Amino acid sequence: MKNMKKWALAAALAIAATPAMAGSALQEILSEGVLKVGTTGDWNPMTMKDPATNSYKGYDIDVMTELAKDLGVEVEFVATDWKTLVSGVTSGKYHMTGSASISPKRAKAAGYSISYFSLATVPLTLTKNADRFREWTDLDKADVTVAATLGTTHESQVKEFFPNAKHKIVEAPARDFQEVLSMRADASITSNVEAKKLVQKYPQLMIVPVSKPKAPTPIAMLLPQADQVWINYVNTWISLKKERGFFDKIGAKWNLL
């Protein structure tokens, strides 16, 4: 582990010392000694914020803390929400984000790291609706309201998957599943990762037993689109950490494997 840290820091310093690389976020991170990471704090088990302490925990938090350690800097988690996740990167509010699903819309404005995890979309409903909703088609009806959260990939998916249903788009800090719990929506869609945690926390919720999840999607970190130096460094770090089992270890810790 010590050798890994020494390698990462040495590589970062060597790259950042190159005159052509002076404008990179990597140079700024090393000069200021701080890696700024945008995170929403509302995606269990990836990123969860404790309002009492303003501290974060989760899969993403562990990953970003490790990246900062290998860079030899401190990590600062910057609060953001889904609708401003990309703009926080493009405006320089933070150097990168935690996990975000890869989408062409986001890629028009921001860059991505290579992927290190995948997820898919599933619907949630109340357990009392078990007989009513069994498949995707059961939700695509005019008398059904399906919720999603503004700024997430699920916002567009809910319209794509359920063209005949009513759509309820909520804005953070409100969340789509809360609309189901309060019975303002019949169902919501979210990642299979979050759905698993939500049904554990709220026994009145259930995952609709669809034959197959939709939209399998790779997960990656959002980065400044034009900063190839920083993107290259992060990609190198991810590749090395994957080979050495780091992502498997963190995935197991948060029950993602």
Residue ranges and their predicted role:
Residues 24, 153-167, 207-209, 238-257:
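Ligand-binding clefts/hinges and TM-proximal coupling segments of bilobed small-molecule sensing domains
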Residues 61, 76-87, 168-182, 217:
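Short helix-initiation/N-cap motifs at beta->coil->alpha
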Residues 118-122, 196-239, 257:
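Periplasmic-binding protein-like
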Residues 23-100, 108:
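Extracytoplasmic small-molecule ligand-binding "clamshell" domains
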Residues 84, 100-109, 156-160, 181-182, ...:
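A ligand-binding cleft/hinge motif common to bilobed small-molecule-binding domains
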Residues 35-36, 71-74, 90-99, 144-145, ...:
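Alpha-to-beta junction loops
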Residues 26, 56-60, 107-119, 207-211, ...:
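A structural signal for short loop-to-beta-strand junctions that line the ligand-binding cleft
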Residues 127-144:
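Flexible hinge/capping segments at coil-to-helix
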